[in-house]
């Protein structure tokens, strides 16, 4: 594990090497109240936020904490938190025998308890918390420590499961069911009736089904990009511990995974409708081309979670930029796919197509079907992909393709400090990239998708600054003032004191009616709107 440097420029900006790496937590705590930082070394938080205590755990006044999800580090007041972490309670059965029960916590979810009937309402994947240290005695078993989070991939029988670690790199392996506290992947709810849950939830396949998924995935798990005739590409070698995974000495299957990222059946083809990248690029108006030279480069990035909107899965990307700002971005699988395809074409040597060793990381290729279990694993694979991407040489990260991928689009969030504000998943065309005919490493022609197909001049892009955060939305140019306020309320909540920047007069003017709105939208530079959240 990479060690975090103990210095930082601001209270919430970490780190020079890897802002999302953390030291092993000594405690896990949850906020009881809201708190706004008063010094540069403090961290702001809201009620219900979780932190890892990494220092001064016995101090009566201040904890030194790290939030691995948001990438923040600093000091918080002890009086504002309750300690959760991992506890051990000794209970006595009716026969007097001692029984040890363990409780643990998923640090970035609000844990709720639900009945087994609620779990059966949909095909929801499971993850688990390892309750006891498990020492692998065979190559096909999964070495795991108490408190480690794992995702359940398949079931062998009523005693053994196939699982893969979440918080670290590693392939799948066998682990006893009795060593795991199962939880619902989305809600974090503990599944108390383990046997019924494992047998009845359809998203946990049997080993035979997973074997077929492994074979399908192995066929499709190829590096994205084009290869000329006669070119070959070396695939990552299989992990020795998972290359031949044998269950109960009677079922053996090939796991198409290595120790770095992927897992059988973890990706799906979402490129619908089927179009070429060139046709997508040609359909975007040239007025949307953007000069990326002034854009900051990405310092660190992660895929924190996945969501679903209108039957389409999208991924929450958190990024830290070279200017110190934090971005929460909505990205679809097509965005990753299009980016990787063109990135490999733009840098063929770094893609391993010449004599040099490949340095561009692999990402999961498309397969036929998408479900919640596949999307959860894909989120982890893409998380590894982005973290490996951020370790590339600066000349690659400074390329315009990379800058565009992390550029805030309509609905995305940008803030000078880490924020839990979620981006809005707006309907739009996938990110498209077109390569220049000459000097590919110096410039790229990049097209930014619009939220929806519109005619030129029919929409107005509005940036809204609310405190330290900036939001973006696109509205029809002829929208009424009432409808505009309604859309603003739906996105940001009740706001007041609306104003906008008049670029011609170089001053801030009030936005009170439709005439003010029309004047603001007529500016060539777009609209910068200022708002204050209403205080009740």
UniProtKB/Swiss-Prot annotation:
GO cellular component, one term: plasma membrane of cell tip
UniProt key word Hydrolase: no
Keywords: Repeat, SH3 domain
Region (Disordered): 88-115
CDD domains, sorted: PB1, PX_Bem1p, SH3_Bem1p_1, SH3_Bem1p_2
GO biological-process terms attached to the record: conjugation with cellular fusion; establishment of cell polarity; positive regulation of mating projection assembly; regulation of conjugation with cellular fusion; regulation of establishment or maintenance of cell polarity
Pfam families (UniProt xref): PX, SH3_1
Domain SH3: from-to ranges: 24-86, 123-185
Comp. bias regions, Low complexity: 101-115
GO molecular function: phosphatidylinositol binding; protein-macromolecule adaptor activity
PROSITE patterns: PB1, PX, SH3
PX domain residues: 293-413
InterPro entries for this protein: Bem1/Scd2_PX, Bem1/Scd2_SH3_1, Bem1/Scd2_SH3_2, EF_Hand_1_Ca_BS, NADPH_Oxidase/PX-Domain, PB1-like, PB1_dom, PX_dom
Boundaries of every PB1 domain copy: 459-533
Subunit: Scd1, scd2, cdc42, and ras1, in its GTP-bound state, act cooperatively to form a protein complex.
Function, in words: Required for mating and morphogenesis. Interacts directly with scd1 and with cdc42. May bridge and facilitate scd1 and cdc42 interactions.
PANTHER family: SH3 AND PX DOMAIN-CONTAINING PROTEIN 2A, SH3 MULTIPLE DOMAIN
Protein name: Protein scd2/ral3
Protein source organism: Schizosaccharomyces pombe (strain 972 / ATCC 24843) (Fission yeast)
Source lineage: Eukaryota, Fungi, Dikarya, Ascomycota, Taphrinomycotina
């Amino acid at each position: 594990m990479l060690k975090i440097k103990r210095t930082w420029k601001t209270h919430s900006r970490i780190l020079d090497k890897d802002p999302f790496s953390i030291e092993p937590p000594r405690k896990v705590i949850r906020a009881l109240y809201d708190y706004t930082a008063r010094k540069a070394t403090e961290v702001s938080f809201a009620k219900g936020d979780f932190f890892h205590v990494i220092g001064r755990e016995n101090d009566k006044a201040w904890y030194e904490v790290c939030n691995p999800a948001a990438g923040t580090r600093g000091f918080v007041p002890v009086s504002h938190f309750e300690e959760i972490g991992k506890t051990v309670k000794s209970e006595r059965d009716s026969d007097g025998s001692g029984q040890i029960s363990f409780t643990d916590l998923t640090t970035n979810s609000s844990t709720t308890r639900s009945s087994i009937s609620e779990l059966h309402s949909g095909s929801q994947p499971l993850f688990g918390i390892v309750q006891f240290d498990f020492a692998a005695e065979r190559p096909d078993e999964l070495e795991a420590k108490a408190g480690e989070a794992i995702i359940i991939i398949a079931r062998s029988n009523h005693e053994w499961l196939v699982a893969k670690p979440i918080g670290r790199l590693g392939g799948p392996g066998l682990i006893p069911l009795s060593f795991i506290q199962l939880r619902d992947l989305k809600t974090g709810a503990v599944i108390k009736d383990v046997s019924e849950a494992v047998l009845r939830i359809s998203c946990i396949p049997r080993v035979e089904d997973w074997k077929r998924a492994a074979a399908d995935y192995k066929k499709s798990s190829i590096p994205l990009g084009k290869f000329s005739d006669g070119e070959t590409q070396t695939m990552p070698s299989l992990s020795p511990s998972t290359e031949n995974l044998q269950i109960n000495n009677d079922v053996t299957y090939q796991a198409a995974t290595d120790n770095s990222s992927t897992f059988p059946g973890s990706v799906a083809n979402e490129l619908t409708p089927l179009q070429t990248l060139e046709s997508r690029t040609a359909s975007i108006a040239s007025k949307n081309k953007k000069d990326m030279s002034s854009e900051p480069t990405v310092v660190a990035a992660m895929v924190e979670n996945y969501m679903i909107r209108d039957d389409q899965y999208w991924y929450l990307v958190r990024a830290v930029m070279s200017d110190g700002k934090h971005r929460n971005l909505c990205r679809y699988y097509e965005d990753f796919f299009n980016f990787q395809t063109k990135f490999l074409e733009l840098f063929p040597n770094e893609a391993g197509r010449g004599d040099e060793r490949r340095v561009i990381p692999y990402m999961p290729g498309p397969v036929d079907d998408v479900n919640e279990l596949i999307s959860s694993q894909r989120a982890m694979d893409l998380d590894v992909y982005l973290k490996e991407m951020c370790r590339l040489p600066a000349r690659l990260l400074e390329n315009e393709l990379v800058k565009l991928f992390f550029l805030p689009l309509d609905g995305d969030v940008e803030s000078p400090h880490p924020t839990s504000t979620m981006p809005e998943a707006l309907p739009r065309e996938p990110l498209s990239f077109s390569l220049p005919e000459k000097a590919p490493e110096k410039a790229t022609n990049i097209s930014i998708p619009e939220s929806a197909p519109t005619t030129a001049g029919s929409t107005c892009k509005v940036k809204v600054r609310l405190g330290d955060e900036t939001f973006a939305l696109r509205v029809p140019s002829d929208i009424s003032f009432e409808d505009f306020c309604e859309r603003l309320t739906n996105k940001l909540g009740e706001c007041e004191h609306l104003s906008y920047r008049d670029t011609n007069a170089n001053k801030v003017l009030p936005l009170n009616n439709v005439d003010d709105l029309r004047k603001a939208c007529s500016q060539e530079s777009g609209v910068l709107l200022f708002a204050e959240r209403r205080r009740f």
